[in-house]
């Protein structure tokens, strides 16, 4: 394996990456993809040339500081010359003189040509009409331009030329100008009639008229394309990803209450296969302390020392306790049956019989 970065620095070579990953992997036991555990203490991390490394570190720091000190005065010298070239101020004054030209250009030159182009022909007829609408300020400008536009198609020959291509266009376009011509005095229709006259003048492109009608009625266009309401099921069939056959309205309903009681598990089946031992409380005429200190005289097994009496509540009997403890320390509590006791019991039994 190649030497680590720290080893190269100690040997006098150039320092590699700040951390040698190969050595780290080798020390932690991950080399070769085999996750073999090794202690996290790696002796190769011990620094050997402490004084040299420290001296070099400080020398490098001093060199860096010295270079910084040398570099900092240089910018100060370079900053000194820039103050003289303060000439950029005159250009700022020139920019201030720039506003006057925009003022000259801002004259309403662009708005004049359209206004002059439309009412250039009717000014002769405007003389009688101008007298009435002069008092109202906002409405007259629209009313002055529109009424002349209505009589133009009938009187001016240019309107007749424009009316010729109208028949090939769709039928709804032709009756609209006729209805507006019949009612020139109604000012409410004027703003709607003026743009249609302009569309007729634009004229030679019949494709624009149906496009505008389509945009005006998006509902009609959508119905003409589909010819039926969009079906969600049909739209799902187009998708390549298989989806559930149930529509959103036909969602399956939960068959039982488990849908609402998610946290509660049904343990009926579990109780069948995994019965739990239930503790039963048995009440006997002998208390626990009495059963540990005395023998039960009512039972026939009490006279037999070899067969221990099973306690009714499941607690360990004295014999079991003695067997567990070893029997030596319990001789004083329960003395072993001696030969004398055996003879006395035998005599009693003979007398009873």
UniProtKB/Swiss-Prot annotation:
Record's compositionally biased regions (Low complexity): 117-132, 142-164
Composition bias type Pro residues, residue spans: 80-91, 165-175
Biased composition regions of type Polar residues, renumbered to the chain: 196-226, 278-304
Taxonomy, superkingdom: Bacteria
Chain spans, region Disordered: 1-21, 75-94, 117-337
Protein name listed in UniProt: Cellulose-complementing protein
Annotated organism of origin: Novacetimonas hansenii (Komagataeibacter hansenii)
């Amino acid at each position: 394996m190649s030497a680590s970065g720290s080893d190269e620095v100690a040997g006098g070579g150039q320092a590699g990456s700040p951390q040698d990953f190969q050595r780290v992997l080798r020390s932690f036991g991950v080399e070769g993809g085999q996750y073999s555990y090794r202690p996290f203490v790696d002796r190769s991390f011990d620094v050997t040339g402490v004084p040299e490394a420290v001296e070099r570190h400080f020398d490098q720091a001093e060199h860096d500081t010295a270079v910084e000190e040398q570099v900092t005065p240089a910018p100060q010298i370079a900053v000194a010359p820039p103050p003289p070239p303060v000439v950029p101020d005159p250009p700022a004054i020139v920019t201030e003189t720039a506003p006057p030209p925009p003022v000259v250009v801002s004259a309403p030159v662009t708005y004049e040509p359209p206004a002059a182009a439309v009412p250039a022909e009717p000014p002769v007829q405007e003389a009688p009409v101008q007298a009435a609408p002069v008092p109202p300020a906002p409405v007259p400008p629209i009313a002055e331009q529109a009424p002349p536009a209505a009589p133009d198609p009938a009187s001016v020959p240019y309107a007749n030329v424009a009316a010729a291509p109208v028949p090939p266009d769709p039928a709804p376009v032709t009756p609209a100008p006729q209805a507006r011509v019949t009612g020139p005095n109604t000012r409410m229709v004027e703003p709607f009639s003026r743009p249609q006259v302009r569309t007729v003048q634009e004229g030679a492109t019949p494709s624009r008229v149906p496009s505008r009608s389509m945009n005006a009625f998006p509902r009609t266009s959508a119905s003409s394309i589909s010819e039926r309401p969009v079906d969600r099921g049909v739209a799902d069939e187009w998708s390549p990803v298989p989806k559930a056959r149930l529509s959103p309205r036909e969602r399956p309903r939960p068959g039982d209450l488990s849908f609402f009681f998610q946290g509660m598990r049904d343990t009926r089946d579990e109780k069948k296969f995994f019965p739990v031992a239930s503790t039963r409380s048995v009440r006997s005429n002998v208390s626990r302390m009495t059963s540990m200190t005395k023998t039960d005289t009512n039972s026939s097994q009490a006279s037999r020392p070899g067969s221990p009496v099973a306690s009714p509540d499941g607690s360990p009997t004295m014999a079991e306790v003695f067997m567990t403890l070893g029997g030596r320390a319990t001789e004083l509590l329960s003395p072993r049956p001696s030969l004398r006791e055996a003879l006395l019991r035998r005599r009693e039994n003979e007398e009873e019989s």
